[in-house]
Design a protein with these regions (language model features):
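Catalytic-core regions of core metabolic enzymes
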Residues: 2-117
Length: 117
């Protein structure tokens, strides 16, 4: 969960809350460079700091950070992404160009993606 937070009303809080409270039985790794613990779970600065293998990353960071996060996921060997972040083709030409770059990175690393947004 990249972009996890404790901030009420934030999508990164709500998704993490749902994952840990509604019968998901796998491991969950919150990622946020400014936190050490979220929802009583150790938090990592980047996906690269997570000691275990990660098969799916849920991404809820600002659009300006998504490409870098995808690179980190690729380096980590993550094969699946769910990109919740908004600001891609739904906002116009600049967003569409950013989405094209995102898709190119996903293909470069051989990942599968749901999203963005």
């Amino acid at each position: 969960m990249i972009g996890a937070t404790n901030r009420r009303g934030a999508i990164g809080r709500e998704i993490l809350h749902n994952i840990i409270n509604y019968e998901f039985e796998g491991k969950v790794f919150p990622v946020n460079p400014t936190k050490t613990v979220i929802h009583s779970i150790k938090c990592y600065s980047t996906i690269l700091d997570v000691p275990d293998a990660v098969d799916l990353a849920v991404i809820v960071v600002p659009k300006e950070l998504v490409l870098n996060v995808v690179d980190q996921c690729g380096e980590k060997g993550v094969k699946g992404l769910v990109v919740i972040t908004a600001g891609f083709k739904e906002v116009g030409e600049a967003g569409a160009k950013l989405e094209e770059k995102l898709l190119a990175k996903v293909r470069q690393y051989g990942m599968r993606m749901i999203g963005p947004n």
